[in-house]
């Protein structure tokens, strides 16, 4: 078999007339003293910044395997000057975007709202914004507190987000036309102690699940994950249910990811806190029926899921599904991004080395119908800085497509990347 090589790698700007023009933007990444993995200071020269909100960068990736086949990765700023983008694709192939937008452009401003947009592939842009949050709130500068989104079988968009001042998660859903969102409502009453990171939400058919971590912050080894389940598209939810084992603990300031395997099976990936130091990536599968949990099981840990650390790493992870309904998890261990096919009984695998010796963080994953798997993340981050965008592309068989991405794209403060598959099988990346 002929090896896969990067035949063409060019970064181009897509203008309003969809013509392609070469660019050579170089952006400054300042030293990162808060990054515990970064051992050396570094400086990047800068000669230009992206100045137009919503400007699109295209990375054309020519991949050779016998005959030429071209995969395209469109790299685009989050619309509206927004940050913390979340992308999801529904069963019909529609791309949905959730993001936070500040009300004022001043650097010190924090207050704003969540907005939703649907991607219009024929026009290569997102549609008009629709406000999600009923009241404005201050953005959390940590990625772990990000909002989450899922799309149900009837077309409704379901959103959950975290407000630390209220020590509460809030939920809202759209109408089936996705033209407006209902008044936000609180999620937690019983298991609300020690909320310190974002919840996640999943949907399939008429089922919706909201999952979060809770418990005393001073006793991480006794925390666990909880959830509420709806079987009527979010109209009503179950009582709050304990879903995880308290024997494993739960890292207080790491977010989690959840996804439905089928209408009665929920996958939850979260970081434990065994004896306060075993911050391993746990893969929990919960079986339930009629809003009641019937059973739960943990998958055996592989080496790359294990992380001994006495402090909280403030990490995030992401789950998506391929064309064969296999669930894929991307996560961080010791400053490196890893990938794992859930339920396959195989070990987690590393993704790629960083540009320089520094920390990789906040991964997202998207998989097209051919099985090509794109993983994106940030590097040289801090608590507030998004860092430098990096990515890696894998073929369906796990082989490395080695796109050779070397672009210097700076992720905005407080933000992280997101990825989705376009209807034509190409990829969209927001930052």
Language model regions located:
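Extracellular, repeat-based ectodomains that mediate carbohydrate processing or recognition
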Residues: 70-431
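Repetitive helical segments and hydrophobic/amphipathic motifs
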Residues: 10-13, 22, 26, 64
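Short hydrophobic targeting helices and cationic amphipathic motifs
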Residues: 18-22, 26, 33-37
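Position-driven detector of the extreme protein N-terminus
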Residues: 2-3, 28, 40, 90, ...
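Bacterial N-terminal signal peptides that target proteins for export
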Residues: 40-57
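Bacterial N-terminal signal peptides
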Residues: 54-66
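Short alpha-helix boundary/capping segments
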Residues: 1-10
């Amino acid at each position: 078999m002929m090896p896969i090589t990067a035949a063409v790698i060019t970064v181009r700007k897509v203008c309003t007339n969809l013509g392609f023009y070469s660019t050579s933007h170089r952006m400054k990444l300042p030293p990162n003293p808060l990054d515990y993995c970064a051992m050396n200071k570094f400086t990047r020269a800068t000669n230009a910044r992206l100045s137009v909100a919503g400007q699109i960068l295209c990375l054309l990736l020519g991949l050779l395997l016998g005959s030429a086949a071209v995969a395209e990765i469109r790299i685009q700023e989050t619309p509206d000057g927004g940050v913390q983008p979340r992308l999801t694709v529904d069963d019909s192939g529609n791309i949905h975007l959730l993001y936070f937008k500040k009300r004022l452009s001043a650097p010190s401003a924090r207050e704003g709202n969540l907005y939703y947009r649907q991607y219009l592939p024929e026009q290569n842009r997102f549609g008009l914004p629709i406000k999600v949050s009923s009241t404005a709130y201050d953005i959390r500068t940590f990625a772990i507190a990000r909002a989450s989104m899922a799309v149900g079988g009837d077309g409704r968009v379901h959103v959950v987000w975290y407000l630390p001042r209220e020590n509460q998660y809030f939920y809202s859903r759209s109408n089936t036309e996705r033209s407006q969102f209902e008044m936000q409502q609180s999620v937690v009453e019983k298991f609300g102690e020690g909320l310190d990171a974002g919840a996640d939400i999943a949907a399939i058919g008429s089922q919706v699940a909201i999952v979060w971590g809770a418990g005393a912050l001073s006793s991480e080894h006794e925390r666990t994950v909880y959830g509420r389940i709806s079987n009527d598209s979010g109209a009503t939810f179950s009582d709050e249910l304990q879903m995880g084992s308290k024997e494993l603990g739960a890292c207080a300031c790491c977010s989690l990811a959840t996804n439905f395997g089928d209408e009665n099976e929920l996958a939850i990936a979260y970081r434990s806190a065994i004896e306060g130091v075993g911050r391993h990536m746990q893969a929990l599968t919960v079986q339930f029926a009629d809003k009641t949990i019937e059973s739960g099981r943990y998958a055996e840990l592989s080496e790359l899921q294990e992380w001994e650390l006495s402090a909280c790493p403030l990490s995030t992870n992401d789950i998506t599904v391929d064309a064969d309904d296999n669930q894929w998890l991307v996560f961080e261990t010791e400053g490196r991004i890893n990938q794992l096919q859930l339920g396959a009984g195989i070990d987690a695998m590393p993704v790629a080395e960083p540009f320089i010796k520094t920390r990789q963080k906040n991964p997202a994953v998207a998989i097209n119908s051919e099985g090509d798997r794109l993983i994106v993340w940030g590097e040289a981050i801090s608590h507030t800085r998004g860092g430098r965008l990096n990515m890696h592309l894998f073929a369906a068989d796990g082989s490395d497509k080695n796109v050779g991405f070397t672009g210097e794209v700076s992720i905005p403060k407080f933000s992280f990347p997101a990825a989705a598959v376009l209807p034509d099988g190409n990829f969209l990346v927001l930052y």
